[in-house]
């Protein structure tokens, strides 16, 4: 199996769009609706992202079926759970996600630089990916992600520290909410 970063790049050549398969929790038949989305939209996508609140409503067999169907259509599967616990919990959670067919997991780097780096290294050994959150789209997230911190004589905002950790930790991608175009621009310049 090839690396996640190579697989997503290959899929993105056809289309750079990742479907955020985010349904209202009250919507019934999530599995069948998700399978229908994959079958109808796969030619326009490179991947599908499933949020935590939807995963909680599906059993292991349903999740595996969704991921297999996505793979059969050439799509990458991303678990958007913003994983951010102690290292052992992160590793066990990631292993369970991999066993259900996910290709990558979205994490919140609040877990710490070392835990993030270790999760990336272990995931990469299994050809899986880690996508790290830098800043959330929710308006109230500004209060935390833009906190000014001082770290070894360097003042910066928390999202900038998270970006530094993502780069040095060799994550496969970062996430910045679309509601913050200046921060997207900052992150893009920092990566290139």
Locate each region found by the language model.
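Conserved anion-binding
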Residues: 13, 23-26, 87-181, 190
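Charge-biased, low-complexity intrinsically disordered regions
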Residues: 3, 57, 86, 182, ...
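Short beta-strand/loop segments at the ligand-binding rim of alpha/beta enzyme cores
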Residues: 70-82, 127-130, 189-192
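Conserved N-terminal beta1-alpha1 strand-loop-helix module at the mouth
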Residues: 1-77, 154-159, 165-172
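Conserved PLP phosphate-binding loop immediately N-terminal to the Schiff-base lysine helix
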Residues: 53-56, 82-90
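General beta-strand structural signal in soluble alpha/beta enzymes
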Residues: 19, 49-50, 77-81, 106-107, ...
């Amino acid at each position: 199996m090839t690396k996640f970063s190579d697989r997503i790049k290959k899929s993105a050549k056809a289309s750079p769009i990742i479907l955020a398969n985010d349904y209202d929790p009250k919507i019934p038949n999530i599995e069948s609706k998700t399978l229908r989305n994959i079958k109808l939209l796969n030619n326009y996508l490179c991947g599908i992202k499933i949020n935590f609140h939807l995963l909680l409503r599906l059993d292991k067999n349903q999740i595996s079926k969704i991921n297999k169907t996505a793979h059969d259509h050439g799509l990458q599967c991303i678990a958007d759970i913003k994983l951010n616990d102690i290292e052992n919990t992160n590793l066990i959670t990631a292993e369970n996600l991999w066993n259900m067919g996910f290709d990558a997991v979205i994490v919140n780097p609040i877990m710490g630089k070392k835990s993030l780096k270790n999760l990336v290294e272990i995931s990469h050994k299994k050809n899986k990916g880690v996508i790290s959150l830098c800043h959330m789209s929710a308006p109230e997230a500004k209060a935390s992600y833009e906190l000014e911190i001082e770290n070894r004589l360097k003042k910066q905002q928390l999202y900038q520290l998270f970006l530094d950790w993502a780069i040095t930790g060799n994550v496969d991608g970062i996430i910045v909410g679309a509601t913050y175009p200046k921060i997207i621009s900052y992150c893009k310049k920092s990566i290139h």
